[in-house]
Amino acid sequence: MPSVERTGLGTIVIGVDTSGSIGEEELEQFAGEISALADEAKPEAIYVVYCDAAVQAFQQFGPSEPIHLEPKGGGGTDFRPVFEWVEANNIAPVCLIYLTDLCCYSYPPIPEYPVLWVTDSRRMAPFGETVRITAD
């Protein structure tokens, strides 16, 4: 019997912190996390939004597209622009996942969708759920 590949979730937005405090090692770890999420959850669409103090670029991936990240940035840090980008582009994500070191104090108002902060630091975000990842 032929197999049918289904999508599991709706649209996911992934904010990637590309500020100056994020190095190549962290970006590689973030890329691995995004690829694992795409393989496991099979969302309908993934928007990867690169942000330092402003949104620098974004990429959109479909459910079966290979994930190849092209990060842009290197300045200061502000988390608000990713959330503003979601609203400005009329995207209704099932969740927003932010990959960051949490070295920032500029948080947006709490959105209506769930937010997961994925970090390699011991800091905690003021809303949503904070998950710590460690290097393998």
Summary of predicted features, one role per range:
Residues 1-13, 25:
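Acidic, polar low-complexity linker/tail segments
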Residues 1-3, 34-37, 83-86, 104-105:
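Generic recognition of flexible, low-complexity loop/linker segments
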Residues 18-28, 32-67:
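Redox- and metal-dependent alpha/beta enzyme cores, enriched for Fe-S-associated oxidoreductases
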Residues 111-113, 126:
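Short, structured coil segments at secondary-structure junctions
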Residues 23, 106-109:
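Extracytoplasmic/secreted cell-surface and envelope-processing proteins
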Residues 11, 45-47, 95, 114:
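Residues at the starts of beta-strands that form the adenosine-phosphate
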Residues 47, 51-106, 119-121, 132-136:
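Von Willebrand factor
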